[in-house]
Structure formats: structure tokens, C-alpha cells
Amino acid sequence: MLTNADREQIIAQYQRGESDTGSPEVQVALLSARINDLQNHFKAHKADHHSRRGLIRMVNTRRKLLDYLKSKDLGRYTTLISQLGLRR
């Protein structure tokens, strides 16, 4: 689970402006952190199907945000996926 300090650190790293919290880069970075936390959760709790549904929803949301960013600005997209280490 992400703490507020972790969340603020991610926002500070990926924000485009001083008060930016909603840009696609920030949203994708926060979703990626939550997805990674849930993947670690599933290593210990394999039968947690309710949370797995939430994980799939987060992955789909992240994919849609990445597709949007790719259509709007390819440079920002490639920079973001290289920073996050995504395999797209």
C-alpha cells in the first residue's frame, strides 16, 4: 500500500508543473506503483480474486492512459515508459 510520502514522491518526480497532479504521466506512475504493490500481494495471497479484479481494472486504466499519451505526444510517451521500465 502506498503511503502519502510515497505518493508525494512519485508526484514530485513525474509532475510537469508546480501544482500538477493530474497529468497522464503522474496518473500512470501512481497506477504503476499500485499495480506493483498488488503483484507483491498476490505472491502471498493467490486466492484473492476480489483484489485481482481491481488489479485488472488498474492495468486497463493505465493502458488507456498510455494509449492517450502516445496519440498526443510520442516523446513524452517514450520517456515515461523508459522511466517506469514498462515493456510497451
UniProtKB/Swiss-Prot annotation:
Q: What SMART domains does the entry give?
A: Ribosomal_S15 (SM01387)
Q: List, in alphabetical order, the GO biological process terms annotated in this UniProt record.
A: translation
Listed A to Z, the keywords are: Ribonucleoprotein, Ribosomal protein, RNA-binding, rRNA-binding
Q: Which domain of life does this protein belong to?
A: Bacteria
Give disulfide pairs as residue numbers: none
GO molecular function terms attached to this record: rRNA binding; structural constituent of ribosome
**What does UniProt give as GO cellular component?**
cytosolic small ribosomal subunit
Q: So what family is this one in?
A: Belongs to the universal ribosomal protein uS15 family.
User: What this chain does, per the record?
Assistant: One of the primary rRNA binding proteins, it binds directly to 16S rRNA where it helps nucleate assembly of the platform of the 30S subunit by binding and bridging several RNA helices of the 16S rRNA. Forms an intersubunit bridge (bridge B4) with the 23S rRNA of the 50S subunit in the ribosome.
> Could you describe the subunit structure of this protein?
Part of the 30S ribosomal subunit. Forms a bridge to the 50S subunit in the 70S ribosome, contacting the 23S rRNA.
Q: What is this protein called?
A: Small ribosomal subunit protein uS15
Supply the source organism's classification. Answer: Bacteria, Pseudomonadati, Pseudomonadota, Gammaproteobacteria, Moraxellales
